[in-house]
Amino acid sequence: AGVPKDTDPECLRRPKKIGTDSYITAWGPNEYTPIGNLSNYEYRDKLKNIKEPALIINGTNDLCTPLVAKTMYDSIPNSRWELFDDCRHACFVEDTDRYCRLLNEWMEQND
């Protein structure tokens, strides 16, 4: 899960070229398993202070696991959470039609 396949769009397969060293120093390999300088940064208590409507989207093969997404959903007032089956973090690429329908609907309700 989470590893690009040869059949995936090029934007999901290409290696990152910029910011990798800084990112790894700050977070580690990714923001969901932090082992870098920011590993002790606690954000969960701040989520309740978000006043704007929030749309939380993640995929079942995402490093942002359903537990992480549900934690955000449970903590942010006026939020909505959508879980995309068989998608990684780039749901907008892997399930473009559903993503666009969802985003348009949410924007009509909240913009």
Whereabouts are the PLM-identified features?
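Conserved alpha/beta-hydrolase "acid-adjacent" motif
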Residues: 63-68
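Conserved alpha/beta-hydrolase catalytic His-Asp/Glu region
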Residues: 1-46
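Alpha-helical structural signal in soluble globular domains
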Residues: 13-16, 71, 75
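Short, glycine/charged-enriched secondary-structure capping and boundary segments
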Residues: 69-74, 96-99
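Catalytic active-site module of serine/aspartate enzymes centered on a nucleophile-bearing elbow/loop
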Residues: 79-111
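Acidic, amphipathic alpha-helical patches
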Residues: 43-47, 69-72
